[in-house]
């Protein structure tokens, strides 16, 4: 175990500075198209929405981040394509949109047919899970800019205007249904890599909680895609949705100005216990960085909560309160 408390900011990712950069980038984005293609939401939600007649088109863009560096270490790239799809699709699902098409962007230091084939394998698998088509993309060879590779993509979805879910219906007393993650997913990997480095571990060594796999393989488990959320939307009165990704539970603030009280949270998986122990990371930093076992959240009336939990393999984890974000007695914000 590392003697000092490792943090995301110390590893090089300062969320507050990142938010400042985003604000500086978007402050001047004032032009808005009218008619078909007019924006229906402001910048800052999980996905952007534009007018398309009876429907709203939804767009999200995201990448795999520094998880690709672990794929390089393991020389196994057939799962990061799933991650790329998942990060975008889950953001569309978080506003109630169904994914319909995808384009990818792959930036390379150098060409390799085996590498490219594995990337494509993951993208195809992710698209199949998401029931959508990959309709194009861009591959750029940038040896002076890229060390290794970077993978990102943009996803297009659609939803009837009256069925958009952006959190306005969330009310005091609404119930929180959490859906489990299957690992770290695709956020917080700068801190993950720092923990592995500082604790003296190797990605190729056995994972202490399951010696049938390695640390690297455990960290490369692809991000879960939550397509079952669309079925819940059809059968339940869903008031709000959240994809638990970067900044952990902090991103819940974009859903509603009300608070979240997680009285019975999903138990974090062994990979989170390992990272916390080896990195000497405190509870607050863990919940502000990682999904901590819960990859998606559904907010809905108590009458529909059990049904939603049953449909997704999730559980009731808490309720909407007046303010704050709490996990048991831990104040997140």
UniProtKB/Swiss-Prot annotation:
Catalytic reaction annotation: 2-formamido-N(1)-(5-O-phospho-beta-D-ribosyl)acetamidine + ATP = 5-amino-1-(5-phospho-beta-D-ribosyl)imidazole + ADP + phosphate + H(+)
Pathway noted in the entry: Purine metabolism; IMP biosynthesis via de novo pathway; 5-amino-1-(5-phospho-D-ribosyl)imidazole from N(2)-formyl-N(1)-(5-phospho-D-ribosyl)glycinamide: step 2/2
GO terms, biological process: 'de novo' IMP biosynthetic process; adenine biosynthetic process
Tree of life domain: Archaea
EC annotation from Swiss-Prot or TrEMBL: 6.3.3.1
Keywords, in A-Z order: ATP-binding, Cytoplasm, Ligase, Nucleotide-binding, Purine biosynthesis
Keyword Ligase applies: yes
GO cellular component, one term: cytosol
Recorded GO MF terms: ATP binding; phosphoribosylamine-glycine ligase activity; phosphoribosylformylglycinamidine cyclo-ligase activity
Entry-linked SUPFAM superfamilies: PurM C-terminal domain-like, PurM N-terminal domain-like
CDD domains: PurM
Location within or outside the cell: Cytoplasm
HAMAP family: AIRS
Family: Belongs to the AIR synthase family.
Annotated protein name in UniProt: Phosphoribosylformylglycinamidine cyclo-ligase
Organism for this UniProt entry: Methanococcoides burtonii (strain DSM 6242 / NBRC 107633 / OCM 468 / ACE-M)
């Amino acid at each position: 175990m590392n003697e000092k408390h490792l943090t995301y900011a110390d590893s090089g990712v300062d969320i507050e500075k990142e938010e400042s950069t985003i604000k500086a980038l978007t402050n001047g984005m004032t032009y808005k198209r009218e008619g078909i293609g007019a924006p229906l939401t402001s910048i800052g939600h999980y996905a952007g929405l534009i007018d398309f007649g009876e429907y709203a088109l939804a767009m999200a863009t995201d990448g795999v981040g520094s998880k690709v560096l672990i794929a390089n270490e393991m020389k196994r790239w057939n799962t990061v394509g799933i991650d790329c799809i998942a990060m975008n699709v889950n953001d569309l699902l978080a506003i109630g949109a169904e994914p319909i098409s995808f384009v990818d962007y792959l930036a390379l230091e150098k060409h390799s047919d085996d590498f490219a084939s594995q990337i494509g394998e993951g993208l195809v698998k992710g698209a199949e899970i998401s029931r959508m088509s990959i309709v194009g993309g861009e591959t750029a060879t940038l040896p002076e800019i890229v060390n290794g590779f970077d993978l990102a993509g943009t996803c297009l979805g659609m939803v009837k205007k009256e069925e958009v879910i952006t959190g306005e219906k969330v009310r005091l007393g609404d119930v929180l249904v959490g859906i489990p993650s299957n690992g770290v997913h695709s956020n917080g990997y700068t801190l993950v890599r720092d923990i592995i480095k500082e604790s003296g571990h190797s990605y190729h060594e056995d994972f202490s909680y399951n010696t049938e796999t390695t640390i690297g393989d455990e960290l490369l488990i692809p991000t879960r895609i939550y397509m079952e959320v669309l079925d819940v939307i059809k059968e339940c009165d869903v008031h709000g949705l959240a994809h638990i990704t970067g900044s952990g539970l902090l991103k819940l603030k974009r859903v509603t100005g009300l608070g979240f009280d997680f009285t019975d949270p999903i138990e974090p998986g062994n990979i989170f216990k390992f990272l916390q122990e080896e990195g000497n990371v405190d509870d607050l930093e863990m919940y502000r960085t990682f999904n901590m076992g819960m990859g998606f959240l559904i907010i809905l009336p108590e009458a529909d909560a059990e049904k939603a939990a049953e449909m997704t393999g999730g559980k009731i984890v808490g309720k909407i309160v007046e303010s704050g974000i709490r996990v048991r007695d831990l104040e997140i914000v």
